Amino acid sequence: MDKDLKIAFFDSGIGGLSVLAEALRRFSGAEFLYFADEDHVPYGTKSRAQIVRLSLDAVGFLVSRGADAVVVACNTATSAAISELRGAFSVPVIGMEPAVKLAADSFGARPTLLIATPLTIAGEKLARLVGRLECETWSLPLPCLVEFAQDLEFDSPAVRAYLQGELAKFELERLGSLVLGCTHFNYFKDVLREILPSHVRIIDGIDGTLNRLASELGGGLKLACGEDFSELACKFDAEELDAGGGQNARGKSRQCEGSDESARSEQGKKGGDEQGAEEYDGNSGKIYYPNGNSVEYFYSGRALDAAQLHKIEVFLKRLDAMREIN
Protein backbone atom coordinates (compact mmCIF):
# COMPACT_ATOMS: atom_id res chain seq x y z
CA MET A 1 0.00 0.00 0.00
CA ASP A 2 1.16 3.52 -0.68
CA LYS A 3 0.42 4.81 2.79
CA ASP A 4 0.46 3.46 6.30
CA LEU A 5 -2.91 2.20 7.42
CA LYS A 6 -4.64 4.24 10.09
CA ILE A 7 -6.39 1.88 12.49
CA ALA A 8 -8.57 3.11 15.33
CA PHE A 9 -9.34 1.44 18.65
CA PHE A 10 -12.35 2.51 20.70
CA ASP A 11 -13.25 1.60 24.28
CA SER A 12 -15.28 3.07 27.09
CA GLY A 13 -11.99 3.60 28.93
CA ILE A 14 -8.55 2.03 29.19
CA GLY A 15 -9.57 -1.62 28.77
CA GLY A 16 -9.02 -1.49 25.02
CA LEU A 17 -5.36 -0.67 25.59
CA SER A 18 -4.94 -4.44 26.01
CA VAL A 19 -5.89 -4.88 22.35
CA LEU A 20 -3.83 -1.90 21.19
CA ALA A 21 -0.78 -3.15 23.11
CA GLU A 22 -0.90 -6.47 21.29
CA ALA A 23 -1.33 -4.70 17.95
CA LEU A 24 1.77 -2.61 18.67
CA ARG A 25 3.75 -5.82 19.10
CA ARG A 26 2.37 -7.70 16.12
CA PHE A 27 2.18 -5.08 13.42
CA SER A 28 4.65 -2.67 11.86
CA GLY A 29 4.38 0.63 10.02
CA ALA A 30 0.84 1.42 11.14
CA GLU A 31 -0.76 4.59 12.45
CA PHE A 32 -3.07 3.91 15.38
CA LEU A 33 -5.74 6.05 17.00
CA TYR A 34 -7.03 5.25 20.48
CA PHE A 35 -10.29 6.71 21.80
CA ALA A 36 -11.17 6.22 25.47
CA ASP A 37 -14.59 7.61 26.35
CA GLU A 38 -13.42 8.74 29.76
CA ASP A 39 -16.32 11.18 30.10
CA HIS A 40 -18.82 8.31 30.12
CA VAL A 41 -17.01 5.26 31.50
CA PRO A 42 -18.25 2.71 32.53
CA TYR A 43 -20.55 1.50 29.76
CA GLY A 44 -21.52 -1.77 31.41
CA THR A 45 -24.18 -0.24 33.65
CA LYS A 46 -25.73 2.04 30.98
CA SER A 47 -28.76 1.33 28.81
CA ARG A 48 -28.35 -0.08 25.33
CA ALA A 49 -29.69 3.16 23.80
CA GLN A 50 -27.09 5.21 25.67
CA ILE A 51 -24.26 2.94 24.54
CA VAL A 52 -25.39 3.06 20.91
CA ARG A 53 -25.41 6.86 20.96
CA LEU A 54 -22.01 7.12 22.64
CA SER A 55 -20.49 4.52 20.32
CA LEU A 56 -21.76 6.28 17.20
CA ASP A 57 -20.24 9.54 18.44
CA ALA A 58 -16.89 7.89 19.20
CA VAL A 59 -16.57 6.01 15.93
CA GLY A 60 -17.75 9.06 14.00
CA PHE A 61 -14.91 11.03 15.56
CA LEU A 62 -12.37 8.36 14.62
CA VAL A 63 -13.60 8.14 11.04
CA SER A 64 -13.34 11.93 10.79
CA ARG A 65 -9.68 11.54 11.80
CA GLY A 66 -9.08 9.28 8.81
CA ALA A 67 -9.46 5.80 10.30
CA ASP A 68 -9.30 3.06 7.65
CA ALA A 69 -10.77 0.55 10.12
CA VAL A 70 -12.17 0.72 13.64
CA VAL A 71 -11.76 -1.93 16.32
CA VAL A 72 -14.47 -1.70 18.97
CA ALA A 73 -12.13 -2.90 21.73
CA CYS A 74 -15.00 -3.05 24.19
CA ASN A 75 -17.15 -6.13 24.68
CA THR A 76 -20.03 -4.06 26.04
CA ALA A 77 -20.10 -1.65 23.08
CA THR A 78 -19.84 -4.60 20.69
CA SER A 79 -22.79 -6.32 22.33
CA ALA A 80 -24.94 -3.20 22.35
CA ALA A 81 -23.99 -1.29 19.22
CA ILE A 82 -22.02 -3.28 16.64
CA SER A 83 -24.93 -3.58 14.18
CA GLU A 84 -25.65 0.16 14.32
CA LEU A 85 -21.97 0.98 13.87
CA ARG A 86 -21.60 -1.21 10.81
CA GLY A 87 -24.74 0.30 9.34
CA ALA A 88 -23.56 3.86 9.90
CA PHE A 89 -19.99 3.71 8.58
CA SER A 90 -18.39 2.42 5.38
CA VAL A 91 -15.04 1.47 6.96
CA PRO A 92 -14.63 -2.01 8.47
CA VAL A 93 -15.81 -2.13 12.08
CA ILE A 94 -14.45 -5.10 14.05
CA GLY A 95 -15.96 -6.06 17.38
CA MET A 96 -14.79 -7.92 20.47
CA GLU A 97 -16.65 -11.03 21.45
CA PRO A 98 -15.91 -13.28 24.44
CA ALA A 99 -13.78 -16.25 23.38
CA VAL A 100 -16.26 -18.79 24.72
CA LYS A 101 -16.12 -20.89 21.55
CA LEU A 102 -12.35 -21.14 21.81
CA ALA A 103 -12.74 -22.14 25.46
CA ALA A 104 -15.38 -24.73 24.60
CA ASP A 105 -13.30 -26.20 21.79
CA SER A 106 -10.23 -26.42 24.01
CA PHE A 107 -11.71 -27.38 27.38
CA GLY A 108 -15.27 -28.45 26.58
CA ALA A 109 -15.23 -31.44 28.90
CA ARG A 110 -15.34 -28.99 31.80
CA PRO A 111 -17.55 -25.91 32.32
CA THR A 112 -16.44 -22.46 31.19
CA LEU A 113 -16.90 -19.41 33.42
CA LEU A 114 -17.39 -16.12 31.58
CA ILE A 115 -16.79 -12.91 33.51
CA ALA A 116 -18.05 -9.70 31.90
CA THR A 117 -20.17 -6.59 32.45
CA PRO A 118 -23.89 -6.95 33.21
CA LEU A 119 -24.91 -5.70 29.77
CA THR A 120 -22.66 -8.14 27.91
CA ILE A 121 -23.97 -11.07 29.94
CA ALA A 122 -27.59 -10.03 29.38
CA GLY A 123 -27.09 -9.40 25.65
CA GLU A 124 -28.79 -11.37 22.89
CA LYS A 125 -25.55 -11.78 20.95
CA LEU A 126 -23.90 -13.65 23.80
CA ALA A 127 -27.01 -15.78 24.30
CA ARG A 128 -26.91 -16.83 20.64
CA LEU A 129 -23.20 -17.58 20.80
CA VAL A 130 -23.45 -19.65 23.98
CA GLY A 131 -26.54 -21.40 22.64
CA ARG A 132 -24.48 -22.88 19.81
CA LEU A 133 -21.95 -24.44 22.17
CA GLU A 134 -22.05 -27.99 23.43
CA CYS A 135 -20.44 -27.32 26.78
CA GLU A 136 -21.67 -25.93 30.08
CA THR A 137 -21.11 -22.16 30.34
CA TRP A 138 -21.52 -20.14 33.52
CA SER A 139 -21.50 -16.34 33.67
CA LEU A 140 -20.60 -13.80 36.33
CA PRO A 141 -21.03 -10.01 36.06
CA LEU A 142 -18.13 -8.09 37.61
CA PRO A 143 -18.92 -4.38 37.05
CA CYS A 144 -16.65 -3.16 39.85
CA LEU A 145 -13.53 -4.43 38.05
CA VAL A 146 -13.94 -1.75 35.40
CA GLU A 147 -13.82 1.00 38.01
CA PHE A 148 -10.90 -0.63 39.81
CA ALA A 149 -8.95 -0.68 36.54
CA GLN A 150 -9.78 2.92 35.68
CA ASP A 151 -8.45 3.94 39.11
CA LEU A 152 -5.15 2.04 38.67
CA GLU A 153 -6.19 -0.30 41.49
CA PHE A 154 -5.08 -3.70 40.26
CA ASP A 155 -4.09 -5.92 43.19
CA SER A 156 -5.24 -4.08 46.30
CA PRO A 157 -6.91 -5.84 49.25
CA ALA A 158 -10.24 -4.48 47.99
CA VAL A 159 -9.72 -6.04 44.55
CA ARG A 160 -8.71 -9.37 46.05
CA ALA A 161 -11.66 -9.42 48.44
CA TYR A 162 -14.07 -8.55 45.63
CA LEU A 163 -12.80 -11.27 43.30
CA GLN A 164 -12.54 -13.90 46.02
CA GLY A 165 -16.07 -13.18 47.18
CA GLU A 166 -17.59 -13.27 43.69
CA LEU A 167 -15.69 -16.34 42.48
CA ALA A 168 -16.56 -18.21 45.68
CA LYS A 169 -20.09 -18.53 44.27
CA PHE A 170 -18.83 -21.22 41.87
CA GLU A 171 -17.24 -24.67 42.11
CA LEU A 172 -13.93 -23.53 40.68
CA GLU A 173 -12.39 -27.01 40.72
CA ARG A 174 -14.92 -28.07 38.09
CA LEU A 175 -13.87 -25.38 35.63
CA GLY A 176 -11.73 -25.87 32.57
CA SER A 177 -11.38 -22.21 31.66
CA LEU A 178 -12.22 -18.66 32.68
CA VAL A 179 -13.04 -16.30 29.80
CA LEU A 180 -12.37 -12.58 30.15
CA GLY A 181 -15.43 -10.98 28.56
CA CYS A 182 -14.32 -7.40 29.16
CA THR A 183 -11.04 -5.87 27.99
CA HIS A 184 -10.66 -4.10 31.35
CA PHE A 185 -10.28 -7.49 33.02
CA ASN A 186 -6.86 -8.14 31.45
CA TYR A 187 -5.33 -5.94 34.16
CA PHE A 188 -6.27 -8.51 36.83
CA LYS A 189 -4.81 -11.71 35.42
CA ASP A 190 -2.31 -12.12 38.25
CA VAL A 191 -4.97 -11.89 40.97
CA LEU A 192 -7.28 -14.21 39.06
CA ARG A 193 -4.43 -16.67 38.58
CA GLU A 194 -3.82 -16.75 42.34
CA ILE A 195 -7.49 -17.46 43.11
CA LEU A 196 -8.20 -20.02 40.39
CA PRO A 197 -7.10 -23.66 40.58
CA SER A 198 -3.90 -24.22 38.62
CA HIS A 199 -5.60 -26.29 35.90
CA VAL A 200 -8.05 -23.51 34.94
CA ARG A 201 -6.94 -21.62 31.83
CA ILE A 202 -7.50 -17.84 31.53
CA ILE A 203 -8.58 -16.90 27.99
CA ASP A 204 -9.27 -13.54 26.31
CA GLY A 205 -10.47 -12.64 22.82
CA ILE A 206 -7.58 -10.43 21.71
CA ASP A 207 -5.95 -12.88 19.29
CA GLY A 208 -9.20 -13.55 17.45
CA THR A 209 -9.97 -9.83 17.19
CA LEU A 210 -6.59 -9.00 15.65
CA ASN A 211 -6.93 -11.94 13.26
CA ARG A 212 -10.25 -10.54 12.10
CA LEU A 213 -8.73 -7.08 11.71
CA ALA A 214 -5.98 -8.45 9.47
CA SER A 215 -8.49 -10.44 7.45
CA GLU A 216 -10.69 -7.38 6.91
CA LEU A 217 -7.77 -5.33 5.63
CA GLY A 218 -6.72 -7.98 3.13
CA GLY A 219 -2.93 -7.85 3.32
CA GLY A 220 -2.57 -4.22 4.32
CA LEU A 221 -1.10 -5.11 7.71
CA LYS A 222 2.43 -6.39 8.13
CA LEU A 223 3.81 -8.36 11.02
CA ALA A 224 6.62 -6.82 13.01
CA CYS A 225 8.84 -9.64 11.74
CA GLY A 226 8.02 -8.70 8.15
CA GLU A 227 5.41 -11.35 7.30
CA ASP A 228 1.95 -10.72 5.92
CA PHE A 229 -0.34 -11.20 8.89
CA SER A 230 -3.36 -11.73 6.68
CA GLU A 231 -1.94 -15.11 5.69
CA LEU A 232 -2.33 -16.19 9.30
CA ALA A 233 -5.85 -14.82 9.73
CA CYS A 234 -8.69 -17.29 10.21
CA LYS A 235 -11.59 -16.92 7.77
CA PHE A 236 -15.06 -18.33 8.32
CA ASP A 237 -18.20 -18.47 6.19
CA ALA A 238 -20.86 -15.78 6.43
CA GLU A 239 -23.29 -17.97 8.33
CA GLU A 240 -20.82 -18.25 11.20
CA LEU A 241 -20.65 -14.49 11.64
CA ASP A 242 -21.73 -13.10 15.01
CA ALA A 243 -20.87 -10.13 17.21
CA GLY A 244 -17.14 -10.31 16.65
CA GLY A 245 -17.18 -10.74 12.87
CA GLY A 246 -17.11 -8.03 10.28
CA GLN A 247 -17.62 -7.00 6.67
CA ASN A 248 -14.65 -6.51 4.40
CA ALA A 249 -14.56 -3.97 1.61
CA ARG A 250 -16.10 -6.45 -0.85
CA GLY A 251 -18.94 -7.29 1.54
CA LYS A 252 -17.88 -10.87 2.27
CA SER A 253 -18.27 -11.79 5.93
CA ARG A 254 -15.29 -13.19 7.76
CA GLN A 255 -14.75 -14.23 11.32
CA CYS A 256 -12.20 -15.91 13.51
CA GLU A 257 -13.50 -16.87 16.91
CA GLY A 258 -10.04 -17.36 18.30
CA SER A 259 -6.52 -18.46 17.50
CA ASP A 260 -3.77 -20.47 19.06
CA GLU A 261 -2.53 -18.29 21.90
CA SER A 262 0.99 -19.60 21.38
CA ALA A 263 1.06 -17.19 18.45
CA ARG A 264 0.92 -14.33 20.94
CA SER A 265 4.01 -15.55 22.71
CA GLU A 266 5.83 -16.09 19.41
CA GLN A 267 4.93 -12.67 18.07
CA GLY A 268 6.06 -11.12 21.33
CA LYS A 269 9.51 -12.57 20.76
CA LYS A 270 9.67 -11.40 17.15
CA GLY A 271 8.03 -8.04 17.64
CA GLY A 272 9.89 -7.00 20.74
CA ASP A 273 9.14 -7.17 24.42
CA GLU A 274 7.63 -4.24 26.32
CA GLN A 275 6.20 -1.71 23.90
CA GLY A 276 7.39 1.44 25.62
CA ALA A 277 7.10 4.77 23.85
CA GLU A 278 10.23 5.88 22.02
CA GLU A 279 9.37 9.44 21.03
CA TYR A 280 6.63 12.03 21.41
CA ASP A 281 5.92 14.53 18.64
CA GLY A 282 4.44 17.61 20.27
CA ASN A 283 3.31 19.05 16.94
CA SER A 284 1.30 16.06 15.74
CA GLY A 285 0.43 14.64 19.15
CA LYS A 286 1.72 11.24 18.07
CA ILE A 287 3.68 8.86 20.24
CA TYR A 288 6.11 6.69 18.30
CA TYR A 289 6.69 3.08 19.30
CA PRO A 290 9.01 0.30 18.10
CA ASN A 291 8.26 -1.41 14.76
CA GLY A 292 7.51 1.93 13.08
CA ASN A 293 4.09 2.31 14.72
CA SER A 294 2.58 5.51 16.08
CA VAL A 295 -0.44 6.25 18.27
CA GLU A 296 -2.60 9.31 18.82
CA TYR A 297 -4.57 9.08 22.06
CA PHE A 298 -7.88 10.80 22.78
CA TYR A 299 -10.10 11.02 25.84
CA SER A 300 -13.66 11.57 24.58
CA GLY A 301 -12.30 13.45 21.56
CA ARG A 302 -9.66 15.50 23.41
CA ALA A 303 -5.93 15.06 22.90
CA LEU A 304 -4.10 13.96 26.03
CA ASP A 305 -1.77 16.16 28.06
CA ALA A 306 1.62 15.03 29.39
CA ALA A 307 0.25 13.70 32.69
CA GLN A 308 -2.44 11.69 30.92
CA LEU A 309 0.08 10.25 28.47
CA HIS A 310 2.26 9.20 31.40
CA LYS A 311 -0.74 7.40 32.88
CA ILE A 312 -1.23 5.56 29.58
CA GLU A 313 2.33 4.27 29.84
CA VAL A 314 1.58 3.01 33.36
CA PHE A 315 -1.39 1.07 32.02
CA LEU A 316 0.69 -0.37 29.17
CA LYS A 317 3.40 -1.51 31.58
CA ARG A 318 0.80 -3.27 33.70
CA LEU A 319 -0.56 -5.03 30.63
CA ASP A 320 2.93 -6.09 29.63
CA ALA A 321 3.34 -7.75 33.03
CA MET A 322 0.00 -9.57 32.60
CA ARG A 323 0.56 -10.67 29.01
CA GLU A 324 1.92 -14.18 29.51
CA ILE A 325 -0.38 -15.12 32.39
CA ASN A 326 -2.92 -17.71 31.34
Predicted regions mapped to residue ranges:
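Non-catalytic structural scaffold of enzyme domains
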Residues: 1-260, 264-326
